[in-house]
Each structure stands twice: as structure tokens, then as C-alpha cells.
A protein has these predicted regions:
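Catalytic subdomain that performs nucleotidyl-dependent activation
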Residues: 147-229
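ATP-dependent adenylation/nucleotidyltransferase module used to activate substrates
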Residues: 2-153, 158-162, 166, 189-197
Length: 230
């Protein structure tokens, strides 16, 4: 058995209850995948998006619904080490990625106020646009259960408002496009266990604010979201 096959098997055996069943629960409950969909699975290079890619591959193998997948990697300005790490991990995991470039890190590097927020918005815009060019009608992001809770807390503590991260939503600016979050019910602790059991090493956020920990994939970087984790 190839190593990628062992990693795939662990998702539906060792982590069947904690990861696979929670993934399926989200997909079914929110009707995320439909007949004829072409879904761009957006890969940042971290543990969450890489797990999402593997789960979506497994879903395509086992589900009766007919749908297509594209595994989309946007290079926002990674250094050569991080870029190569993503390519190597995709090869290890048997994920056929499509990679394209943008200058997001260069732009965000000049912004002092809320750079992480601006970076996230710009990333999503580029991903929507590229996915549309490739004929996709949906993008899938790797946000998990902890991200949902942290978003609510961040809104309450920093924005004085109640806001949440929806499991799926229609794009306001890209007609016909929808965003889905299939890991909506999967907890980060279980993703970390999956990563460690399979001895996988992914990149963390790799902009100038967090580059000192890009290879550790264990948080850090001083963002508001990281403050929530602590």
C-alpha cells in the first residue's frame, strides 16, 4: 500500500467517528455537494485544507452523486521553501493541484491596519475568480468547528457584534458562485491528531507577520484569531 493510501485509509478508519462522520454530517446537513457540481477545493498548504482535499477525494470515490473536483493552490508570494513544501505535500498525498500566482503578500505588506483581514478577503476574491475561469460553480474552504467558534468570539470581543461563519453562502460579487465549508463540524484537535499520526508536516501562514513559524503548523503569529486560541 502506498503511503497516500495509508493516509486516506486513516481518515475513514482510525478517524472515522471524529473526522469522516463529522465531514459527511456537514456535507449532508447543508446539502453542500450536488449533482453536476464542479468544486474548487482551495489549498493554502496547511493541515486543514490538505485534510479537506483528502476528504473531498474520498467523497468523490464513495458518493453516488456525480461531481468534479479541482484542487486550487494560489501562491500569494510564498518564499521558495514554502512553495516547494506545498508541491511536495500535494505529491505525497496524491492531490493533483493547479497552482497560480498573485501579489497579495506584496500588497498586504504595505498595510498597517488589519492586514490579516485584508489578506483573507483578497485571497477569496482571487480564488473565486480563478475557480470561475476553470468552470467551477463552488469553492470549498478548510474552515473547521473551532474557526466557527473563534469567529463568533472575535465578533463579540473586537467588533461588538454577533457574527458567525456560515457553512455555505452565495458570493455577492461572483454571480453563480457558492462557498462551502465541509469541515464545519470537524474539531481542530482531531485534525492535529490525524496530522501527527501520519507524520505530516505542513506550512503555517507564510506572510511576513508569521514567517518565523511557517513550517511548524502549530499556530502563532500574533493574530486576533490566535489570541482566541489562547
Amino acid at each position: 500500500m502506498e503511503r497516500y493510501e495509508e493516509i486516506e485509509k486513516s481518515i475513514i478508519t482510525t478517524y472515522r467517528k471524529k473526522i469522516w462522520c463529522q465531514f459527511i454530517k456537514g456535507v449532508k446537513e447543508f446539502d453542500m455537494v450536488q449533482e453536476g457540481d464542479k468544486i474548487a477545493v482551495c489549498i493554502s498548504g496547511g493541515k486543514d485544507s490538505m485534510l479537506l482535499a483528502k476528504c473531498m477525494q474520498e467523497l468523490k470515490k464513495h458518493r453516488k452523486v456525480n461531481f468534479d473536483l479541482v484542487f486550487l493552490v494560489m501562491d500569494p508570494g510564498y518564499n521558495p521553501i514554502n512553495r516547494q513544501k506545498i508541491i511536495n505535500n500535494a505529491k505525497l498525498l496524491n492531490i493533483p493541484i493547479t497552482m497560480f500566482e498573485s501579489n497579495i503578500f506584496e500588497v498586504v505588506d504595505k498595510i498597517d491596519d488589519h492586514p490579516c483581514y485584508i489578506c483573507a478577503r483578497m485571497r477569496r476574491g482571487y480564488l473565486y475568480k480563478k475557480a470561475q475561469e476553470l468552470g467551477c460553480n463552488k469553492i470549498a474552504l478548510g474552515h473547521h468547528f473551532d474557526d466557527v467558534i473563534e469567529t463568533i468570539l472575535m465578533g463579540m470581543l473586537y467588533g461588538a457584534q454577533m457574527q458567525t461563519m456560515m457553512p455555505k453562502l452565495h458570493s455577492t460579487y461572483h454571480e453563480g458562485m457558492e462557498l462551502i465549508r465541509p469541515l464545519y463540524y470537524v474539531k481542530e484537535a482531531d485534525i492535529i491528531k490525524w496530522r501527527e499520526r501520519n507524520d505530516l508536516h505542513f506550512i503555517q501562514c507564510a506572510c511576513r507577520f508569521t514567517e518565523h513559524c511557517t513550517m511548524c503548523d502549530n499556530g502563532g503569529g500574533g493574530s486576533k484569531r490566535e489570541e482566541m486560541k489562547k
